[in-house]
Amino acid sequence: MAAAGLDTLRLEDSDDDFKYEEVDVMSDGEDDASEDLDAALRKLQQFTSKQEAATGPARTTEVKPGQVVKKPEVIDDFLRNFFIKMGLSRTCECFEAEWYELKATGRLDNSTTVPDVYLRNAELEDDVAGLRRELAEAKSIAGRASATWDKFRKERDFHRMHHKRVAQEKNKLLTDLRRLKEHYAKYEPTILELKKKYETLMKEKMMMSLERDKLAARVDALEQVASSPLPGAERSLGGQSTAAAGGGASGRALGATNRALTGDVPPAAGAAAAAATGRSGAVSAGPRSGWASLNAPPRRNPYADLEFPAAPVKMLSLNKTFKGHLLSVANLALHPTKPILVTASDDKTWKMWHMPGGDLIMCGEGHKDWVAGVDFHPAGTCLASGGGDSAVKIWDFEKQRCVTTFTDHKQAIWSVRFHHLGEVVASGSLDHTVRLWDLPAGKCRMALRGHVDSVNDLAWQPFSSSLATASSDKTVSVWDARAGLCTQTYYGHQNSCNGVSFNILGTQLASTDADGVVKLWDTRMTAEVATINTGKHPANKSCFDRSGQVLAVACDDGKVKAYSTTDGVLQAELAGHEDAVQAVLFDPAGQYLVSCGSDNTFRLWS
């Protein structure tokens, strides 16, 4: 370092003796202008070669923008870091003095980088430490999983043992059930036999009751004849003629009943009734020998002077539900004097039940299609039914069979009704006609024509020969059954009329239609009295209570709705049916109400 300083001083001292060469500026510019691009490139290449020779080979790897490149640490930096890390400060100073001296004198080769193996070892140590931690965590998880698996295995063994025990109990129960079935099968014939005996006894009981009523009526008639001041010759007449002469209305009904039950039908004196050509032009066959007469003197309504309290419909609730049919129950009929109900069903049968217990008395099978109409004889000794097979059948309870079948209708029959004398049955059909059947003659008395659509329902005015019909042509007509003439037609419904019914006095007529509208008509003034809207669902059938102040309506929404006939106010709404209610009836004694519906049931409300 001292020698270098002396040389510098000597150069500075000799600056004044240095001879400078004059350089022309213009000549320098000419030299610059003479250089071309190739010379510049050659010089640049030479300079680059010298730099590469001085610093070592340069990396030619291009680095993409955004890419991070890790450059290895040079050897001297590595050693410094090592000395400092280990606390060898004096060693580090000696190393730096010797390192920089060798570098200044040019005796030191180009510095190299630290081999990557050290860095790789450090990274691997970190990875090993991480893997050891993960291994410890995995061992912990495996331990917990093993404990859970042991728990599940124990539970599996427990449930497997429990399942085996349940299977053994099941097999034991199946064995016991099989034994019970075999044991029950031994008693089944006995049960069937007892059931048949029970049904036979119930039928015999009913027959005896009917026979008792007939004998009581005959005894009363004979007592009246015996007490009346009649000649002896007239007293010696037969029981049937005596009852007709001295028994009044009951005697006439009894005589008609006896003829119908015993089958003592006089031969017909002529052909069937002539068909009508219009509502006002129907032609009656007229009274003939062997035919029932509807021209008897008018009978006074026995209820005209009686007053009954209104049915307590607000207090009614569902008492019992009976499911005695396989299909929809379409109609109902109550016995005139006994607590007996008949139901007509789509399963081609009618069934008789004792109310209010619901015990089955008998079942009528014979129709080839559904049964829609049923009605009791006024004396309660026989039953009329009609249905989809276009037949009207008369069933005798004493003989326990069908005694007469009328097949003049061309299409299905919707309704059948007995006249109050019991010798004539009216039927309404899908063939647009109403036919009157003469039971003594066993033939069709006349056909009432005039409706232009199906006759859905009909009702006799109590103790008269007037017949009301409801039709799908939106009209309600009243017919004189003696002359076969239409005496009155009521207009006002906007849809098919489904049902018609009279009150007990015959002074008021109710009609229902498919719009849910119920209209009340005064039969004396032949005018509409009130209109009741039951809702958007069709109203099927209606029935007055014995006071005439309450009207029950069977609706398609599964409800029975009771209205006041004076102001049309809803008094009660009986909900219980699961489908449409088809028919409804009040008990003649005013104790309960019966309804039937498309849910295959009939229900008792009390």
UniProtKB/Swiss-Prot annotation:
Q: How does it assemble?
A: Inter-microtubule bridges in flagella.
Name where it's found: Cell projection, Cilium, Flagellum
Q: Tell me where the WD repeats sit in this chain.
A: 324-354, 366-396, 408-438, 450-480, 492-522, 534-564, 576-606
Q: Which SUPFAM superfamilies match?
A: WD40 repeat-like
Q: Which UniProt keywords apply?
A: Cell projection, Cilium, Flagellum, Repeat, WD repeat
Example GO CC term: the record gives:
motile cilium
- Protein name per the record: Flagellar WD repeat-containing protein Pf20
Q: Tell me which domain of life the UniProt entry assigns to the organism this sequence originates from.
A: Eukaryota
Does Repeat appear among the keywords? yes
Which parts of the sequence are annotated with region: Disordered? 229-250
- What gene codes for this chain? PF20
**CDD domains reported for this sequence:** WD40
